[in-house]
């Protein structure tokens, strides 16, 4: 295990997720001030997910062929330039273009960094190392919105954008200086090119993890998009109270990543995925029946626990598959595509159900999707341990 490389990747990903957390909650307000309607605000968020999803397969496979460092440094530098572009944006169309470019940059960073960590992770420590690495994501997403709001209130929204640029620049410099040159970064040297996506797509274990990741992040998108509306409409909660609730789930899941990753290396990974998935489904279902702030408080903790149990096991299995297929970047890209598609589809499908029926049915729909995907994932991953040890 190369501690310098791991620490550099950890800090770089923390910096970029912190930067995202600094500005994303502020984007709807800024877009509205530029004259965006509700539809264009949807385009602003959709452009990011669309470009990220489109470019993930390309950069994932290319990083298997060309190395990780060039993509990490390019993506982080692009984030810095995007932050400057936010400040200079004067109309909605340019704002949408910026978000599209940011999605492309995002496709170069997280899956490539996760693939790099997967490559340097010792056997039988996949859960612990990926769980520890995931702390960088959850920490950035937990701290970012709080700091971003404080910076905006004190210095204005442009300062929040520039803060994103600063932390992205720090991440870029860390990777540029401390990651080894491309020629020396491959700690596992495959003796053949990475598998093509059409071959990886036929791997039932990848399909199972993709399906679970899609369902789980669709539930995240549902909760993040509609919990504020539900909490305000049903219980008249303040914006600060709603912010605490949303952050609570992220924080809980983040705190569980490392200990549950440790368990994933020692116990049945499929069982942990099933338990975490069912806890997540139960939490989403409970939102319909809770009463008041404290009911939502408990439901959000439960939602975070579900992710905290399941995600390290999912990532551990992903690393094992990537190592076995000698296509770590491509496999990570596929799983991240599931994440992106879930975050894109979850709020949209929930919105359709809310408009056609009522808000509570959106949470019911998320519950059903999660339970079905847990069952299918369990079926498809049968025999995984024997396959992994061949």
Q: Where do the PLM segments sit?
A:
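Short amphipathic helix-loop junctions that connect adjacent transmembrane helices
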Residues: 26-38, 225-240
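Cytoplasmic helix-loop-helix junction between adjacent transmembrane helices
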Residues: 98-137
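Paired small-residue
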Residues: 93-101, 294-302
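Helix-breaking motifs and short loop linkers at transmembrane-helix boundaries and internal kinks
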Residues: 35, 67, 88-93, 236, ...
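Residue-level signature of mid-helix packing/kink "hotspots" within the transmembrane helices
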Residues: 49-57, 141-142, 250-258, 343-344
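Intracellular juxtamembrane helix-capping segments at the cytosolic ends
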Residues: 108-121, 309-323
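Structural signature of the two symmetry-related core transmembrane helices
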Residues: 70-84, 165, 271-285
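Juxtamembrane intracellular "pre-TM" segments in multi-pass secondary transporters
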Residues: 1-2, 180-210
């Amino acid at each position: 295990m190369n501690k310098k490389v791991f620490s550099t990747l950890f800090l770089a990903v923390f910096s970029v997720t912190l930067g995202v957390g600094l500005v994303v909650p502020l984007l709807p307000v800024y877009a509205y001030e530029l004259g965006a309607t509700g539809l264009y605000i949807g385009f602003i968020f959709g452009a990011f997910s669309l470009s990220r999803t489109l470019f993930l397969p390309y950069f994932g496979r290319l990083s298997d062929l060309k190395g990780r460092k060039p993509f990490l440094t390019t993506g982080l530098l692009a984030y810095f330039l995007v932050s400057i572009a936010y400040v200079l944006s004067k109309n909605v169309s340019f704002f949408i273009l910026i978000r599209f470019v940011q999605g492309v940059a995002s496709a170069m960073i997280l899956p490539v960094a996760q693939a790099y960590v997967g490559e340097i992770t010792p056997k039988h420590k996949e859960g612990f190392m990926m769980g520890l690495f995931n702390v960088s994501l959850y920490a950035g997403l937990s701290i970012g919105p709080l700091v971003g709001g404080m910076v905006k209130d004190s210095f204005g929204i442009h300062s929040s954008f520039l803060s994103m640029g600063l932390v992205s620049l720090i991440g870029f410099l860390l990777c540029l200086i401390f990651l080894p040159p491309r020629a020396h970064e491959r700690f596992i040297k495959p003796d053949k090119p990475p598998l093509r996506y059409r071959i990886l797509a036929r791997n039932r274990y990848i399909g199972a993890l993709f399906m679970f990741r899609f369902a789980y992040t669709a539930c995240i998108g549902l909760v993040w998009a509609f919990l504020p509306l539900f909490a305000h409409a049903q219980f008249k909660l303040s914006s600060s109270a709603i912010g605490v609730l949303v952050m609570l789930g992220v924080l809980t899941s983040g705190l569980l990543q490392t200990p549950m990753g440790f368990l994933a290396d020692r116990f049945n990974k499929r069982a942990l995925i099933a338990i975490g998935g069912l806890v997540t489904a139960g939490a989403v279902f409970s939102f319909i029946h809770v009463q008041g702030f404290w009911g939502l408080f408990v439901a959000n903790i439960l939602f975070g626990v579900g992710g905290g149990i399941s995600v390290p096991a999912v990532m551990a299995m992903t690393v094992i598959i990537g190592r076995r297929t000698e296509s770590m970047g491509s496999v990570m890209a596929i799983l991240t595509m599931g994440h992106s598609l879930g975050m894109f589809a979850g709020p949209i499908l929930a919105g359709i159900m809310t408009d056609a029926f009522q808000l509570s049915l959106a949470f019911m729909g998320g519950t059903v999707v999660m339970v079905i995907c847990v069952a299918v994932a369990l079926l498809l991953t049968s025999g995984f341990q024997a396959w992994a040890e061949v």
